C-alpha cells in the first residue's frame, strides 16, 4: 500500500531497534563496569530513552537527573540517521534530497523527529512521522484495497533484523531485547 501511495522504498525499523538495543546494552554494561570498579559517580539505574513522551516528561519534571536516561536514539531516530547518512551516501543521494517518513502508532513521534538534536545542518533525520491512523486515512482516500494487494517484502538497506527488534515495541520488550542481546 505504501508503494501505491508513492513511497519509493519501504523499510522496517526492526533493524534500527536492534541497533538501539545494542547501544543501550553497551551503555548499561559500561555504566555497571565503571560502578563495580569503584566509580560512584556513575548514574544508575539507566532508563530507556526511546519514548519521546516519556523523555519530554522526564526533561521537564526532573531536569537535574538528565544523565540517567540512555543516550541511545529511538529506533525511529536511529533509522532516520542511518537512512540520511549511510544509506543516502551508499545510493549517491544527497542527504537533503532524501525524505524519510516514519509510520508510528504514537503521536509523540512527531515531536521527536522535530527535535533539534535529530537534525544535521537543519535537515531532520526523519522529515515526517505519520500516525497509523493517518496512514489508514491516506490508504482509504486512495481507495487501496488490501485484499487485492500482492504480498511484498520490505526493502533491506542493511540486512535482516533479529527477533529482539520485533518485540521492542511491546510492553517489557526493551528489557527482554536487552537480555537477549
Task: For the regions a language model picked out, list residue spans one by one.
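Iron-sulfur-associated redox domains of electron-transfer enzymes in respiratory
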Residues: 1-181
Amino acid at each position: 500500500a505504501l508503494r501505491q501511495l508513492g513511497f519509493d522504498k519501504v523499510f522496517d525499523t526492526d533493524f534500527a531497534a536492534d541497533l538501539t538495543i545494542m547501544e543501550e546494552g553497551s551503555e548499561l554494561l559500561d555504566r555497571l563496569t565503571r560502578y563495580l570498579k569503584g566509580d560512584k559517580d556513575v548514574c544508575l539505574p539507566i532508563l530507556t530513552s526511546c519514548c519521546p513522551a516519556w523523555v519530554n516528561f522526564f526533561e521537564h519534571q526532573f531536569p537535574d537527573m538528565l544523565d540517567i536516561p540512555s543516550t541511545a536514539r529511538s529506533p525511529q531516530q536511529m533509522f532516520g540517521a542511518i537512512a540520511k547518512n549511510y544509506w543516502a551516501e551508499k545510493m549517491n543521494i544527497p542527504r537533503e534530497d532524501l525524505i524519510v517518513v516514519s509510520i508510528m502508532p504514537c503521536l509523540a513521534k512527531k515531536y521527536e523527529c522535530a527535535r533539534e538534536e535529530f537534525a544535521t545542518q537543519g535537515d531532520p533525520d526523519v522529515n515526517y512521522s505519520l500516525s497509523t491512523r493517518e496512514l489508514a486515512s491516506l490508504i482509504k482516500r486512495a481507495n487501496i484495497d488490501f485484499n487485492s494487494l500482492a504480498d511484498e517484502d520490505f526493502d533491506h538497506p542493511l540486512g535482516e533484523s533479529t527477533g529482539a527488534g520485533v518485540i521492542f515495541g511491546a510492553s517489557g520488550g526493551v528489557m527482554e531485547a536487552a537480555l537477549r542481546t
